[in-house]
C-alpha cells in the first residue's frame, strides 16, 4: 500500500478537494484507493454520530469499505484549532491507534491518502503537531499550495520547514482558490522553479468543485517515489 500525507500551506486552501481528486484519479485507473483524516474539527451530529463534511467527501470518493471511525478517529464539533479541542475534551492523540488502522488498511488498498488538519505546523495537542504526526508515521508528503496572494511566502516557508525536518516531499499541487488573483501563471511558474519537488498539477479555480474534473489536471506519475510503507 502506497501511503502519502496530504498537508497544506494554510487552512481552507483545498486539502480535502485535492485529496479527493487524487483518490478519484487513481480509482478511475482501476486501483483500490482510500482516504483518512485522523483529526477533524467543525463536525456535526448526523444520524446520532459526529461527522465531518470533509470526511464524508473522502468516504464517498473512496472505493474501499472502511468504518467512518477508522477514517476519522478524532472528531470535534467546534471549528477551532485542534490543540484547543483536544485540551477542552481532555483527549490525547494516540499514534498507536492510527498505526493500527493503517495496518488494517494494508490488504484493502493500493493507495492511501492521509489528510492533515490545517497547515503543516498546526499543533494537534500542546506538545504534538501535524509535523510530528508525519514524522511518527514516517510517510512522504504531498503539499497543497492554496494559490492566492501571499502563497509564495506560505509555500516556501512550509517547504523549508519540511526539508529542515528531513521529511520527504514527494510532490505538490497548486490549487487556485482565488478566481480573481492577478498574475496567477507567474506565481505558479515561480513556485515550480523554487520548490524542489515535482508539481503534480495546477488545478484551476472551480466554482462547483468536482474531484473527477479536478483530477484531469493532476499527474500522479510525477510523484518522485513510490515506497510501499504499510
Residue ranges and their predicted role:
Residues 1, 31-32, 107-110:
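Short, high-confidence coil segments that cap the C-terminus of an alpha-helix
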Residues 5, 113-115, 142-144, 173:
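Structural motif
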Residues 5-19:
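Glycine-rich phosphate-binding P-loop
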Residues 17-92, 96, 101-103:
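N-terminal phosphate/diphosphate-binding loop that engages ATP/GTP or pyrophosphate donors
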Residues 58, 98, 102-125:
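Switch II (G3) loop of P-loop NTPases
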Residues 125-148:
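Inter-motif core of Ras-like GTPase G domains
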Residues 159-230:
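C-terminal lobe/tail of nucleotide-utilizing enzymes
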Amino acid at each position: 500500500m502506497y501511503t502519502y500525507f496530504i498537508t497544506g500551506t494554510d487552512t481552507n486552501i483545498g486539502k480535502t478537494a485535492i485529496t479527493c481528486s487524487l483518490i478519484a484519479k487513481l480509482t478511475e485507473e482501476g486501483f483500490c484507493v482510500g482516504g483518512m483524516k485522523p483529526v477533524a474539527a467543525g463536525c456535526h451530529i448526523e444520524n446520532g454520530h459526529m461527522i465531518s463534511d470533509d470526511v464524508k467527501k473522502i468516504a464517498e470518493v473512496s472505493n474501499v469499505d472502511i468504518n467512518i471511525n477508522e477514517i476519522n478517529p478524532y472528531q470535534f464539533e467546534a471549528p477551532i484549532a485542534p490543540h484547543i479541542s483536544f485540551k477542552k475534551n481532555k483527549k490525547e492523540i494516540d499514534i498507536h491507534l492510527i498505526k493500527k488502522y493503517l495496518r488494517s488498511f494494508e490488504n484493502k488498498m493500493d493507495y492511501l491518502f492521509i489528510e492533515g488538519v490545517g497547515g503543516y505546523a498546526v499543533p494537534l495537542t500542546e506538545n504534538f503537531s501535524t509535523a510530528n504526526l508525519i514524522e511518527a508515521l514516517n510517510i512522504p508528503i504531498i503539499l497543497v499550495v492554496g494559490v492566492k496572494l501571499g502563497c509564495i511566502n506560505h509555500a516556501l516557508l512550509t517547504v523549508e520547514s519540511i526539508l529542515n525536518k528531513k521529511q520527504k516531499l514527494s510532490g505538490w499541487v497548486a490549487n487556485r482558490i482565488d478566481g480573481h488573483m492577478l498574475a496567477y501563471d507567474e506565481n505558479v511558474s515561480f513556485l515550480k522553479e523554487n520548490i524542489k519537488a515535482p508539481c503534480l498539477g495546477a488545478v484551476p479555480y472551480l466554482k462547483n468543485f468536482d474531484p473527477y474534473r479536478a483530477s484531469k489536471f493532476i499527474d500522479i506519475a510525477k510523484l518522485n517515489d513510490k515506497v510501499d510503507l504499510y
